[in-house]
Amino acid sequence: MSCSRPCVCSHGTSVEESTWYGFDFYPNLFYNDWLGTTTLPYNPERIPIRYINRPWPSLCWKVTVAVASLFLLLGVAALTTGYAVPPKLELVNESKFSSMEDPVADYNQALMTCRVVGATLCGVAGIMLAVCLFLIASGWMFQDIKAEPLVTETDSPVEVFRDEPEKLSPAFHETSSQSPFLTPPSPFGQQSVQTSQPQRDL
Protein backbone atom coordinates (compact mmCIF):
# COMPACT_ATOMS: atom_id res chain seq x y z
CA MET A 1 0.00 0.00 0.00
CA SER A 2 1.52 3.26 -1.09
CA CYS A 3 1.80 6.22 1.28
CA SER A 4 0.18 9.40 0.06
CA ARG A 5 2.16 11.71 2.39
CA PRO A 6 5.89 12.28 1.96
CA CYS A 7 7.90 10.69 4.72
CA VAL A 8 10.38 13.04 6.41
CA CYS A 9 12.92 11.95 8.98
CA SER A 10 12.86 13.80 12.27
CA HIS A 11 16.65 14.15 12.30
CA GLY A 12 17.98 15.20 8.97
CA THR A 13 17.33 17.29 5.90
CA SER A 14 14.02 17.16 4.09
CA VAL A 15 14.42 16.56 0.40
CA GLU A 16 11.36 18.57 -0.54
CA GLU A 17 11.69 21.58 1.75
CA SER A 18 15.42 21.38 2.60
CA THR A 19 14.62 22.11 6.23
CA TRP A 20 16.64 20.85 9.18
CA TYR A 21 14.43 19.60 12.00
CA GLY A 22 17.13 18.34 14.35
CA PHE A 23 17.97 21.58 16.17
CA ASP A 24 16.86 25.12 16.75
CA PHE A 25 18.74 28.35 17.23
CA TYR A 26 19.46 29.51 20.77
CA PRO A 27 18.00 33.03 20.24
CA ASN A 28 14.76 31.45 19.01
CA LEU A 29 14.62 29.13 22.02
CA PHE A 30 15.28 32.04 24.39
CA TYR A 31 12.58 34.14 22.68
CA ASN A 32 10.02 31.33 22.90
CA ASP A 33 10.89 30.68 26.54
CA TRP A 34 10.55 34.37 27.38
CA LEU A 35 7.08 34.44 25.78
CA GLY A 36 6.09 31.29 27.65
CA THR A 37 5.63 29.27 24.45
CA THR A 38 7.58 26.54 22.73
CA THR A 39 7.02 25.80 19.06
CA LEU A 40 7.63 22.23 17.99
CA PRO A 41 9.36 22.41 14.57
CA TYR A 42 8.29 18.94 13.41
CA ASN A 43 5.49 16.50 14.02
CA PRO A 44 4.15 13.56 11.99
CA GLU A 45 1.11 15.50 10.76
CA ARG A 46 3.28 18.48 9.72
CA ILE A 47 1.16 20.80 11.93
CA PRO A 48 2.98 23.41 14.05
CA ILE A 49 2.06 22.91 17.71
CA ARG A 50 2.55 25.48 20.46
CA TYR A 51 3.01 24.33 24.03
CA ILE A 52 1.80 26.95 26.54
CA ASN A 53 2.94 26.88 30.14
CA ARG A 54 1.14 28.44 33.08
CA PRO A 55 1.76 32.23 33.03
CA TRP A 56 2.21 32.77 36.77
CA PRO A 57 5.11 30.35 37.44
CA SER A 58 6.91 31.50 34.31
CA LEU A 59 6.45 35.18 35.22
CA CYS A 60 7.43 34.46 38.82
CA TRP A 61 10.79 32.89 38.07
CA LYS A 62 11.61 35.48 35.40
CA VAL A 63 10.95 38.36 37.78
CA THR A 64 12.89 36.56 40.52
CA VAL A 65 15.92 36.04 38.32
CA ALA A 66 15.81 39.66 37.10
CA VAL A 67 15.58 41.11 40.63
CA ALA A 68 18.27 38.75 41.93
CA SER A 69 20.61 39.74 39.10
CA LEU A 70 20.02 43.43 39.87
CA PHE A 71 20.70 42.90 43.58
CA LEU A 72 23.83 40.93 42.76
CA LEU A 73 25.20 43.69 40.53
CA LEU A 74 24.47 46.38 43.11
CA GLY A 75 26.03 44.26 45.86
CA VAL A 76 29.20 43.65 43.88
CA ALA A 77 29.45 47.37 43.09
CA ALA A 78 28.99 48.29 46.77
CA LEU A 79 31.56 45.74 47.92
CA THR A 80 34.04 46.93 45.31
CA THR A 81 33.57 50.53 46.43
CA GLY A 82 33.87 49.65 50.12
CA TYR A 83 37.04 47.59 49.79
CA ALA A 84 38.78 49.30 46.86
CA VAL A 85 38.66 52.87 48.21
CA PRO A 86 41.21 53.33 51.03
CA PRO A 87 39.94 54.85 54.28
CA LYS A 88 41.27 58.14 55.59
CA LEU A 89 43.34 58.38 58.72
CA GLU A 90 41.88 60.37 61.59
CA LEU A 91 44.16 63.20 62.78
CA VAL A 92 44.17 63.73 66.51
CA ASN A 93 44.76 67.41 67.21
CA GLU A 94 43.48 69.31 70.20
CA SER A 95 43.08 72.62 68.37
CA LYS A 96 41.32 71.15 65.34
CA PHE A 97 39.68 68.20 67.06
CA SER A 98 36.12 69.35 66.53
CA SER A 99 36.62 70.34 62.87
CA MET A 100 38.67 67.35 61.59
CA GLU A 101 37.05 64.45 63.38
CA ASP A 102 33.59 64.56 61.85
CA PRO A 103 34.43 64.51 58.06
CA VAL A 104 36.97 61.71 58.37
CA ALA A 105 34.72 59.64 60.59
CA ASP A 106 31.79 60.12 58.24
CA TYR A 107 33.93 59.09 55.27
CA ASN A 108 35.10 55.91 56.95
CA GLN A 109 31.58 55.18 58.14
CA ALA A 110 30.32 55.52 54.57
CA LEU A 111 32.88 52.97 53.37
CA MET A 112 31.82 50.58 56.11
CA THR A 113 28.18 51.08 55.15
CA CYS A 114 28.99 50.24 51.52
CA ARG A 115 30.58 46.97 52.62
CA VAL A 116 27.62 46.00 54.77
CA VAL A 117 25.06 46.93 52.11
CA GLY A 118 27.02 45.08 49.41
CA ALA A 119 27.26 41.92 51.50
CA THR A 120 23.53 42.10 52.30
CA LEU A 121 22.54 42.55 48.65
CA CYS A 122 24.75 39.66 47.54
CA GLY A 123 23.26 37.44 50.25
CA VAL A 124 19.68 38.30 49.26
CA ALA A 125 20.49 37.67 45.58
CA GLY A 126 22.02 34.30 46.43
CA ILE A 127 18.95 33.27 48.44
CA MET A 128 16.58 34.30 45.63
CA LEU A 129 18.57 32.40 43.02
CA ALA A 130 18.74 29.33 45.27
CA VAL A 131 14.96 29.38 45.78
CA CYS A 132 14.40 29.77 42.04
CA LEU A 133 16.69 26.84 41.25
CA PHE A 134 14.97 24.71 43.89
CA LEU A 135 11.54 25.42 42.40
CA ILE A 136 12.80 24.61 38.91
CA ALA A 137 14.36 21.36 40.13
CA SER A 138 11.17 20.37 41.95
CA GLY A 139 9.14 20.80 38.76
CA TRP A 140 6.75 23.46 40.07
CA MET A 141 7.70 25.84 37.25
CA PHE A 142 6.80 23.39 34.48
CA GLN A 143 3.30 22.12 35.33
CA ASP A 144 0.02 22.21 33.42
CA ILE A 145 1.53 22.29 29.95
CA LYS A 146 -1.12 22.58 27.26
CA ALA A 147 -0.79 21.98 23.54
CA GLU A 148 -2.80 23.75 20.89
CA PRO A 149 -2.45 24.15 17.11
CA LEU A 150 -0.55 27.23 16.03
CA VAL A 151 -2.70 29.49 13.84
CA THR A 152 -0.94 31.03 10.86
CA GLU A 153 -0.77 34.75 10.09
CA THR A 154 -3.74 34.57 7.74
CA ASP A 155 -5.93 33.40 10.67
CA SER A 156 -6.90 30.32 8.73
CA PRO A 157 -7.92 27.25 10.75
CA VAL A 158 -5.36 24.52 10.93
CA GLU A 159 -6.28 21.51 8.87
CA VAL A 160 -5.88 18.57 11.20
CA PHE A 161 -7.49 15.79 9.16
CA ARG A 162 -7.50 16.04 5.42
CA ASP A 163 -10.12 14.27 3.40
CA GLU A 164 -8.38 11.76 1.20
CA PRO A 165 -9.77 8.95 -0.90
CA GLU A 166 -9.50 5.62 0.80
CA LYS A 167 -7.03 3.33 -0.89
CA LEU A 168 -7.68 -0.31 -0.09
CA SER A 169 -5.52 -3.25 -1.01
CA PRO A 170 -6.70 -5.82 -3.60
CA ALA A 171 -6.93 -8.49 -0.90
CA PHE A 172 -9.42 -6.37 1.04
CA HIS A 173 -11.53 -5.89 -2.08
CA GLU A 174 -11.57 -9.66 -2.71
CA THR A 175 -12.56 -10.34 0.90
CA SER A 176 -15.35 -7.79 0.80
CA SER A 177 -16.65 -9.16 -2.49
CA GLN A 178 -16.81 -12.71 -1.04
CA SER A 179 -18.66 -11.64 2.12
CA PRO A 180 -21.71 -13.87 2.93
CA PHE A 181 -23.76 -10.85 3.94
CA LEU A 182 -23.75 -9.40 0.46
CA THR A 183 -26.58 -10.18 -1.95
CA PRO A 184 -25.48 -12.73 -4.58
CA PRO A 185 -25.69 -11.49 -8.12
CA SER A 186 -28.55 -12.70 -10.24
CA PRO A 187 -27.60 -15.42 -12.75
CA PHE A 188 -29.74 -13.82 -15.39
CA GLY A 189 -28.06 -10.48 -15.12
CA GLN A 190 -29.97 -7.27 -15.00
CA GLN A 191 -33.56 -7.70 -16.11
CA SER A 192 -35.58 -4.83 -17.27
CA VAL A 193 -39.26 -4.79 -16.48
CA GLN A 194 -41.33 -4.18 -19.55
CA THR A 195 -45.04 -3.71 -19.72
CA SER A 196 -46.55 -4.86 -22.97
CA GLN A 197 -50.10 -4.88 -24.13
CA PRO A 198 -51.45 -7.37 -26.65
CA GLN A 199 -51.91 -5.90 -30.02
CA ARG A 200 -55.36 -6.14 -31.48
CA ASP A 201 -55.77 -7.56 -34.92
CA LEU A 202 -57.34 -5.01 -37.10
Curated annotation (Swiss-Prot):
InterPro entries to which the protein is assigned, alphabetical: Neurensin (IPR024883)
Keywords: Membrane, Transmembrane, Transmembrane helix
Region (Disordered): 162-202
Keyword Transmembrane belongs to the record: yes
Subcellular location per the Swiss-Prot or TrEMBL entry: Membrane
Sequence ranges of Polar residues compositional bias: 188-202
Name of this chain's protein: Neurensin-2
Species the sequence originates in: Mus musculus (Mouse)
